[in-house]
C-alpha cells in the first residue's frame, strides 16, 4: 500500500510539472508581445494553479468551435460580396490627403477596399441629440433596422428608442438587435426582450456568458461594437452604449458618461452593413448579406461629401488591424495629435509611437477622465503618465464626468472615431469598429469638441506628478504588471 501511495505521489508531482511545462511551452510558442508573455509566465510560476486556470480561460483568443466554423464558412460569400462591391469603382476615393494616405493605403491592402466617398456625416456629442435623432430615423425606416450594442440599459430616452423600434417592427420593418451577453445582462433580466420579440424584433444575446464553457471560449471576448444601420443607407457608430447617462451607473461616483456618435448617410452604410452581417452570421448562423449600395452619387454629394473608411476588428477580421491603424495614424502626425480615451493602457508599440511623436515636435495631447469606473484601469493608466510627461505629452484629466469618447485627430485633417479604447482588450481582442475620416471640415468639428473637453479638464503638471506619494507609485507599478491582461 505504501508503494501505491508513493507511485501516486510521484505521478502527481510529475503531472503537475508536466502541466506547467506544457502551458509554458504553449505561451512561448504563441507569437505575442513580450510583456504579455512574461506576465503570464510570472503568474503561472508564482500562483501555478490560479495561473494555469486563468491562462486556459483567458490567455488565448478562441471563439469556440461552432462560431469558428461559422466564421470560416461565411468567408467565401463575404469575399464574393466584397469583390462585387469593388466593381463599383466610382464610389471609392481615388486620392487622399497627405496625412491620411498611409492609413488609407493600409486599410485598402488589408481589408480589400478603399475609402468610400460621397457621404454626409454629422458628429453628435450629447446623448439627447443622439437618441432623438435615432428615434426620428427609426420612425422613417421602411425596410430594415439592424443594431448592435455592448450595453442596453432601459430608462429615460432609451425607452423611447425601444418603443419606436417595436413600432417599426409592427409596421413591417425587419428589425434585428444583437446585444453583448455580459454588457447587457441587466437588460436580459427585464421584460424588454420578451416584449421586443413579441413585436417581431429578432433579439440575440451575443457571446453568452456560461461558466460551464469557460475553457471552450474566452469569456472576456466581448461584442463591443455600437452600430445602428437603417435601410442600408443611414448608419450610426461611436462610443455611446444604448443608455441614458441620467439613469446609468449613478452610484459609481464618476458622474454622467460623456460620449460621441457619428451619423452617416450614403454608400459607406453598406460597408458597415457587411460588418454587421458577419457578426450576425457568426452568432446565429444566418446569412444576411446587405444589398449593393446606391452607386449614383450626385455631383453636389461628391463635392460636399466625406470620404470614410470603416475598420472592423475581432475574430474573423484582419488581425491587429485596429492596432496597426492607430500606429500608422500616430506616425503620420506632423503638427498636432489629440487623443481621447476613457481607458489608457496602451501597448508598448503604441506608447513609444506617441512618445516619439511628441519628441519630434508634434503637439500631442491626451484627454482622459479624472475618475474612472474601473479601479484596475485607473491605477494601470497612471503607470504610463511619467513616461508620457517626460516625452512632452500633455495629459488632460477631464472633470465633467466619465469621458467615454474615443477619438483621434491628426493635424486637423485625419479623424478616427469609434468604439476602440486605448487598452489591450480593444486593440487585440474585442469586436470593435472605427471610422477613419479624411476631411478637414469634420476635423474642425471634432477639434471643437476636443477643445471643449480640454476646457473642462485640468492639465497634469509634471513636477506635481513626481511628488505623488510612494504608495501611489507602488500601486501603479503593481497594476502596471497586470496591464497586458486589461
Curated annotation (Swiss-Prot):
One of its GO terms (molecular function) is cardiolipin synthase activity. It is found in: Cell inner membrane. It comes from the Bacteria. Gene3D superfamilies: Endonuclease Chain A. Pfam families: PLDc_2, PLDc_N. GO terms for biological process: cardiolipin biosynthetic process. Its EC number is 2.7.8.-. GO terms for cellular component: plasma membrane. It catalyses: 2 a 1,2-diacyl-sn-glycero-3-phospho-(1'-sn-glycerol) = a cardiolipin + glycerol. It is a multi-pass membrane protein. The active site is at 224, 226, 231, 404, 406, 411. SMART domains: PLDc. The chain crosses the membrane at residues 3-23, 38-58. Residues 219-246, 399-426 form the PLD phosphodiesterase domain. It is an enzyme of class 2 (transferase). Keywords: Cell inner membrane, Cell membrane, Lipid biosynthesis, Lipid metabolism, Membrane, Phospholipid biosynthesis, Phospholipid metabolism, Repeat, Transferase, Transmembrane, Transmembrane helix. CDD domains: PLDc_EcCLS_like_1, PLDc_EcCLS_like_2. InterPro entries: Cardiolipin_synthase (IPR022924), CL_synthase_A (IPR030840), CLS_N (IPR027379), PLD-like_dom (IPR025202), PLipase_D/transphosphatidylase (IPR001736). Belongs to the phospholipase D family. Cardiolipin synthase subfamily. ClsA sub-subfamily. PANTHER family: CARDIOLIPIN SYNTHASE (PTHR21248), PHOSPHOLIPASE D (PTHR21248:SF22). Catalyzes the reversible phosphatidyl group transfer from one phosphatidylglycerol molecule to another to form cardiolipin (CL) (diphosphatidylglycerol) and glycerol. This is Cardiolipin synthase A. It comes from Yersinia enterocolitica serotype O:8 / biotype 1B (strain NCTC 13174 / 8081).
Amino acid at each position: 500500500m505504501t508503494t501505491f501511495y508513493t507511485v501516486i505521489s510521484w505521478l502527481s508531482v510529475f503531472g503537475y510539472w508536466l502541466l506547467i511545462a506544457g502551458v509554458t511551452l504553449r505561451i512561448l510558442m504563441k507569437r505575442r508581445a513580450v510583456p504579455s508573455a512574461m506576465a503570464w509566465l510570472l503568474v503561472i510560476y508564482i500562483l501555478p494553479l490560479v495561473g494555469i486556470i486563468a491562462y486556459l480561460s483567458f490567455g488565448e483568443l478562441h471563439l469556440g468551435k461552432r462560431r469558428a466554423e461559422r466564421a470560416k464558412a461565411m468567408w467565401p460569400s463575404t469575399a464574393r460580396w466584397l469583390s462585387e462591391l469593388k466593381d463599383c469603382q466610382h464610389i471609392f476615393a481615388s486620392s487622399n490627403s497627405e496625412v491620411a494616405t498611409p492609413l488609407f493605403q493600409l486599410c485598402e491592402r488589408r481589408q480589400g477596399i478603399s475609402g468610400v466617398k460621397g457621404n454626409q456625416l454629422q458628429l453628435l456629442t450629447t446623448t439627447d441629440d443622439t437618441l432623438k435623432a435615432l428615434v426620428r430615423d427609426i420612425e422613417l425606416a421602411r425596410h430594415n433596422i439592424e443594431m448592435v450594442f455592448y450595453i442596453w440599459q432601459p430608462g429615460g430616452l432609451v425607452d423611447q428608442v425601444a418603443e419606436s423600434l417595436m413600432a417599426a417592427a409592427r409596421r413591417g420593418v425587419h428589425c434585428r438587435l444583437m446585444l453583448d451577453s455580459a454588457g447587457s445582462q441587466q437588460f436580459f433580466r427585464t421584460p424588454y426582450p420578451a416584449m421586443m420579440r413579441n413585436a417581431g424584433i429578432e433579439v440575440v444575446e451575443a457571446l453568452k456568458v456560461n461558466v460551464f464553457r469557460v475553457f471552450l471560449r474566452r469569456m472576456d471576448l466581448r461584442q463591443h461594437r455600437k452600430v445602428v444601420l437603417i435601410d442600408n443607407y443611414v448608419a450610426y457608430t461611436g462610443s455611446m452604449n444604448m443608455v441614458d447617462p441620467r439613469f446609468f451607473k449613478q452610484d459609481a461616483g464618476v458622474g454622467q458618461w460623456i460620449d460621441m456618435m457619428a451619423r452617416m448617410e450614403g454608400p459607406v452604410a453598406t460597408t458597415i452593413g457587411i460588418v454587421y452581417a458577419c457578426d450576425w452570421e457568426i452568432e446565429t448562423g444566418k446569412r444576411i448579406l446587405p444589398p449593393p449600395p446606391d452607386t449614383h452619387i450626385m455631383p453636389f454629394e461628391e463635392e460636399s461629401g466625406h470620404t470614410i473608411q470603416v475598420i472592423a476588428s475581432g475574430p474573423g477580421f484582419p488581425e491587429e488591424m485596429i492596432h496597426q491603424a492607430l500606429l500608422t495614424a500616430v506616425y503620420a502626425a506632423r503638427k498636432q495629435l489629440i487623443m481621447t480615451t476613457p481607458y489608457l493602457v496602451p501597448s508598448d508599440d503604441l506608447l513609444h509611437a506617441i512618445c516619439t511623436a511628441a519628441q519630434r515636435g508634434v503637439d500631442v495631447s491626451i484627454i482622459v477622465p479624472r475618475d474612472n469606473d474601473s479601479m484596475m484601469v485607473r491605477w494601470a493608466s497612471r503607470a504610463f503618465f511619467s513616461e508620457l510627461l517626460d516625452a512632452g505629452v500633455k495629459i488632460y484629466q477631464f472633470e465633467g464626468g466619465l469621458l467615454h469618447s474615443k477619438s483621434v485627430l491628426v493635424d486637423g485633417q485625419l479623424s478616427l472615431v469609434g468604439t476602440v479604447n486605448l487598452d489591450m482588450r480593444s486593440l487585440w481582442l474585442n469586436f470593435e469598429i472605427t471610422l477613419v475620416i479624411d476631411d478637414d471640415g469634420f476635423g474642425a468639428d471634432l477639434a471643437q469638441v476636443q477643445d471643449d473637453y480640454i476646457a473642462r479638464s485640468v492639465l497634469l503638471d509634471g513636477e506635481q506628478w513626481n511628488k505623488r506619494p510612494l504608495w501611489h507609485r507602488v500601486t501603479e507599478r503593481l497594476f502596471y504588471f497586470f496591464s497586458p491582461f486589461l
